[in-house]
């Protein structure tokens, strides 16, 4: 198989970024007749797609680092989830052309420290900028969707040119729009206008609040089995609320209510969410503050989904139950089944017993991870729908413990296929 690709680049920097003519190099090499020929070529059939792409496309030193630490993981997850091979290559080609330049300089241990580069990523405790995940549905097998979140950065991040690291994410969104004519920018542009800050104001706020290290924006992708790539804009509320002198909760309400075309249609669900928030009992830590929003980057309409993320103060099962039921407002059969599943999860994974529902989980590792919820809002819905997240490693003594407990959980709920393959998949992804 002969690939027609550009010359390799220099040792440093993202030279593809400077030349827009090269931005679709992978999608040209791995689509149409070229991809059909590749799939028929026995000489590459035994090699994983990430290895094939790595061997034939140009990679500078920075590209190589990020491909090996992010692209390879994405590829391994697609292999484990059984994505069709053609879709696997098309997804990696999109990742190479559109996403790979968004990671910026190779991280250094001195990032964010005196004398080092000013920006250190915040998405994970160790400074990682990439959070991949599998969305397991129904049986944990063929419905699995590959997803990931990214905290973009570049040489401007944290400097006077971009104090709050807003520009690298914007560049990524523009590449997404250039790559896909159906990538609708209406909600992104609205979010940018409502929550992002100009350079002068960003510098002023950074000086006024030097101890605040909140991010401004993440971006996320769902790579669906249909071939659709769903982008998600994740703006944070901290800096804009400081600028306006209002609470993050009030800011979230304003932004959602003002969404083009459908903002007023979230009125009932926002009222129910507010009732849930203000009713948070003291023994659960009281009312938490929203952290961020999440917009699906789609044309605003009746199916437009918006999420508000909150982090409760407590990690006990009863705290989780309170959030999951919106303080008792959600009491239908599906919610009851979800509560039972959460109870099983806490029992199997965290070993809580009868009478320990108010006990806080034991923390084995420091860091800001913990329990997180989002409330998903849809137009005309009476109530938002909560989703539960937990940083399991924080509450487990070792990786082996995580593997054993989650395997037991999959087996308990009848996901035998996931239980049988989980330990192997974990090791293969490392």
Show which residues each predicted segment covers.
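Intrinsically disordered, low-structural-confidence terminal and linker regions
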Residues: 1-71
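Fungal eukaryote-biased detector of long internal structured cores
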Residues: 108-304, 312
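Intrinsically disordered, low-complexity regions enriched in Ser/Pro/Gly/Gln/His and often acidic
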Residues: 59-60, 96, 112, 266, ...
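Short Lys/Arg-enriched alpha/beta "domain-start" segment
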Residues: 61-107
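Compact beta-rich and alpha/beta scaffold cores in large eukaryotic transport/transcription complexes
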Residues: 243-430
């Amino acid at each position: 198989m002969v690939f027609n690709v550009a010359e390799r680049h220099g040792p440093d920097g993202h030279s593809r970024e400077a030349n827009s003519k090269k931005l679709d190099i992978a999608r040209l090499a791995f689509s149409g007749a070229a991809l059909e020929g590749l799939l028929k070529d026995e000489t590459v059939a035994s090699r994983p797609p990430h290895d094939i792409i790595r061997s034939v496309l140009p990679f500078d030193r920075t590209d190589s680092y990020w491909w090996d630490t992010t692209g390879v993981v994405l590829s391994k997850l697609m292999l484990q989830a059984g994505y069709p091979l053609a879709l696997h290559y098309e997804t990696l080609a999109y990742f190479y052309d559109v996403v790979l330049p968004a990671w910026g300089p190779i991280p250094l241990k001195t990032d964010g420290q005196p004398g080092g580069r000013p920006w250190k990523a915040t998405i994970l405790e160790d400074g990682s900028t990439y959070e991949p995940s599998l969305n397991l549905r129904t049986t944990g097998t063929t419905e699995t969707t590959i997803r990931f979140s990214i905290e973009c950065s570049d040489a401007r991040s944290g400097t006077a040119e971009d104090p709050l690291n807003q520009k690298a994410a914007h560049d990524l969104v523009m590449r997404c729009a250039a790559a896909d004519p159906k990538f609708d920018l209406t909600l992104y542009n609205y979010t940018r206008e409502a929550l992002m800050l100009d350079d002068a104001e960003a510098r002023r706020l950074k000086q006024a609040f030097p101890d605040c290290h909140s991010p401004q924006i993440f971006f996320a992708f769902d790579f669906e089995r249909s071939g659709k790539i769903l982008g998600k804009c994740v703006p944070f509320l901290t800096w804009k609320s400081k600028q306006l002198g209002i609470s993050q909760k009030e800011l979230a309400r304003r932004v959602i209510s003002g969404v083009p075309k459908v903002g007023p249609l979230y009125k009932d669900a926002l009222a129910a969410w507010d009732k849930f928030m203000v009713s948070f009992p003291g023994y659960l830590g009281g009312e938490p503050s929203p952290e961020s929003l999440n917009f699906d980057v789609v044309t605003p309409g009746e199916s437009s989904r918006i999420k508000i993320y909150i982090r409760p103060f407590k990690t006990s099962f009863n705290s989780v139950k309170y959030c999951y039921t919106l303080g008792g407002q959600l009491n239908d059969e599906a919610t009851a089944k979800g509560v039972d599943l959460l109870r099983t999860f806490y029992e199997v994974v965290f070993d809580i017993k009868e009478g320990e529902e108010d006990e806080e989980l034991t923390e084995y590792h420091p860091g800001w991870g913990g329990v997180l919820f989002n409330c998903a809002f849809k137009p005309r819905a009476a109530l938002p729908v909560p989703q539960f997240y937990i940083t399991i490693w924080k509450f487990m003594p070792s990786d082996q413990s995580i593997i054993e407990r989650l395997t037991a959980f999959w087996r308990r709920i009848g996901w035998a296929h996931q239980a049988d393959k989980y330990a192997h998949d974990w090791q293969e992804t490392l």
